[in-house]
């Protein structure tokens, strides 16, 4: 949503900040004054009075370069009556309210003209196409049919399922099956998937972006293609945006904003961003949600839940917890369209970095925000990957790259609250080389106990102890403790040996390490939580940005002080209470083993007695021969279905040409049934092939 904000740094370069005495929710208040309005707007907005009091909060610096004070919403009191119970005076959009000076004397501000010769806003942003309200995608219509939307969703799912089936079926390749042919066909399917997702709109665009972080669930070709997914759709009309803002905030645009730029500066599937100016001169951005989005999410997620439940029951989709994955995605999607939640995230993120002067977070204007409308401080900057603009301003790109990684390490290791989508569109650079963060709809939180387990995992990796690594992964619910885990232990040990035995010049990138982790998970019972994948993805993205900014960039050098701090902390803990706890735990384990020893000896004696008496029977089955025979039977049935289906198809064509439409239709239906049976047979063959690879 904030992708174009970063390109606006030059808009205010020579403009002088204007100091006004109009109403200011974040400006310095020297006077206690009241404002009255009688503008009637539907049932939501009646006559009201806004009363402001002098703030005692610490001063901060606003975007206009002047000292401001943050006034909480509790300082704003709305009343229907006048100051003394009398009717209030009316204002239009350009009017300023009546006020009282510091001595209590009443003073009236003169109504401003409706049109000014000089605007507070910079020139409009080009390149954002506005979609008229009566055109566009089917999902953009607020009155779309729920039934038609469900049909569109299921048509997409069935088409994707058929494509994947043919991609994975060896018999579907002309001239024989090869891995290169399969990869090429998968790339074509992935490209089709990306375009289809864009056509289906907001729900599927966001799900596609989430899926691009899950290399542990989806083929590499799909992940690579979905990572290119750009959330760019035409903006909806300014008239619709203004009506929506007025309905959500309960007052006309002109009462809330001194100026409101109709042309959006950014547009995405979930909404769009407009620039505006408050009556006190503060420049802000207004994030407006696309109308009807909640209804669309409800319909799509209801259908996707049915699909997830089908995947969960089907053996052909593996042992992944598809219902759990669906629930994670649904939670993330609903959080993204809750702008109150996003505002809270922004405030919390701002507090976390309040003592770090090289990180900037836009201020939230709570009195101009609601569930579907969010007003933020306008903080323009240079897009972090715009190398030409960075060079033109003489910025130190190496320092910027290091700061981007360091800020994320602080989020993961110290605050536990991190930005889950730090792509270049959500990161910009201020004039003092500070990093500006945008868009706080998708955030992640690492709870205290989870952070402790992650630290234990880090220590286990450092010690190259595969057994401890596995136990920590089980504690993190990233590894399912089912069956024999000896193969998992060997895979983990191999990964540790390769990771830690390299020289500094041979260190893998974070993206390569992440790919190795997810490659292991393809054949092992791993189930990485979404938080884990978000962290890996974010670090990979930031590392890529680091290499773009500075070819000599090294993640290891930036992270080394933090890693050393963690190791020092571990050593201090080992010398204290943790050492006592470990000794006590080992003593408990030894006592349990000693107490269970007689039972184990008894079981061994019983086994030996059965073996001596001949009561122990061993049953051996030739499994390979059985599987081969079963596969041959399935292929024979598939061949028979194909012949019968082809015969009925020919009969149908013949009778159709002769005018016997009833017989022809029956033949076509029969041919379709046999074709479905053929597909079912091929699916069973694929299951057998996968089973053979697992043993």
From Swiss-Prot:
GO molecular function: ATP binding; protein serine kinase activity; protein serine/threonine kinase activity
Gene deletion effect: Larger plastoglobules associated with thylakoids characterized by VTE1 accumulation and high tocopherol content. The pale green double mutant atsia1 atosa1 accumulates ferritin and superoxides, exhibits an increased nonphotochemical quenching (NPQ), and have a reduced tolerance to reactive oxygen species (ROS). Lower levels of the highly unsaturated lipid digalactosyldiacylglycerol (DGDG) and of different forms of monogalactosyldiacylglycerol (MGDG) and kaempferol. The abc1k7 abc1k8 double mutant accumulates strong levels of oxylipin-conjugated MGDG and DGDG.
Domain Protein kinase: 259-589
Family matches, as SUPFAM superfamilies: Protein kinase-like (PK-like) (SSF56112)
Pfam families: ABC1 (PF03109)
Domain of life: Eukaryota
UniProt topology in membrane: Multi-pass membrane protein
Catalytic machinery residues: 421
Subcellular localization(s) per the UniProt record: Plastid, Chloroplast thylakoid membrane; Plastid, Chloroplast, Plastoglobule
Keywords: ATP-binding, Chloroplast, Kinase, Lipid metabolism, Membrane, Nucleotide-binding, Plastid, Stress response, Thylakoid, Transferase, Transit peptide, Transmembrane, Transmembrane helix
Membrane-traversing stretches: 633-653, 659-679
Reactions mediated catalytically: L-seryl-[protein] + ATP = O-phospho-L-seryl-[protein] + ADP + H(+); L-threonyl-[protein] + ATP = O-phospho-L-threonyl-[protein] + ADP + H(+)
Induction statement: Down-regulated in response to iron deprivation.
Chain positions recorded as ATP binding sites: 265-273, 287
Enzyme Commission number(s) from the entry: 2.7.11.1
Family membership: Belongs to the protein kinase superfamily. ADCK protein kinase family.
Protein name: Protein ACTIVITY OF BC1 COMPLEX KINASE 7, chloroplastic
Natural source organism: Arabidopsis thaliana (Mouse-ear cress)
